[in-house]
Amino acid sequence: RLLAEDGTVNMVLFDTGVVPIGVYDKEGVPGPDAGFWWYGFWPDDIRYIMKTCKDTGAGASISVFEPGWMKNVVAMAKAGTIPRGSKLNIYFASEKLAVCAPPTREALDFYLSMIDGLDLKWAVGYMGPESVMDTPLARLSLEHGGSFRVGLEDWPNGTSNVDQIKRAKEIIASVGREVITGADAIKYLDIPFPATRPKA
């Protein structure tokens, strides 16, 4: 909130639910030794972020890890409470992680059917041992009017961010889409105010 009030950022993180995240052990059970934790926002956290966006004019980067989270997005969209300038990040995961849907056309189609008719910007993200660009999701998202996430946050053992962006640009160009950055991206997302730099 402090960064949004200062104008340093113009988007804030917005998770729409809580989900258990785990890594499967040799018996096919998530955690605990292999890793298991709860992630997300509880209802009071959601209301706090909604109020922060309303008070500051910040947009929101809205995470969707499970279908129930997308139901929450739809409910907020119908209630008119999704912050202006928001974008959905629909996450998928490899078979090694006990969370999210697999990176398939059918899974993406299911999520998109839930938001059919709603004016929502969206992207796909992928957590796994390879890049989202090594799955069908990257191209499918572009063909369906969305976008995809790249970077070391989702693929920590991958190539550099610069190399991932170069590859992403090639995929985007191959389907006839354009890359937008800076002010154009802010306009595309309809974020109420431009990003600023911290005061010197």
Regions found by a protein language model. Name each.
Residues 1-4:
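Hydrophobic/aromatic-rich structural module bridging two neighboring secondary-structure elements via a short loop
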Residues 7:
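Extended ligand-binding groove/face enriched in aromatic
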Residues 10-151:
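Catalytic alpha/beta core domains of metabolic enzymes, predominantly
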Residues 22-24, 29-33, 158-177:
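C-terminal helical cap(s) of enzyme catalytic domains, especially alpha/beta-barrels
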Residues 72, 159-161, 191-192:
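Short Asp/Glu-rich motifs
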Residues 109, 139, 143, 162-170, ...:
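A generic structural signal for well-ordered alpha-helical surface patches
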Residues 141, 153-156, 172:
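Soluble catalytic regions of large protease machineries
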Residues 166, 170-200:
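Mid-to-C-terminal alpha-helical segments outside catalytic/metal-binding sites
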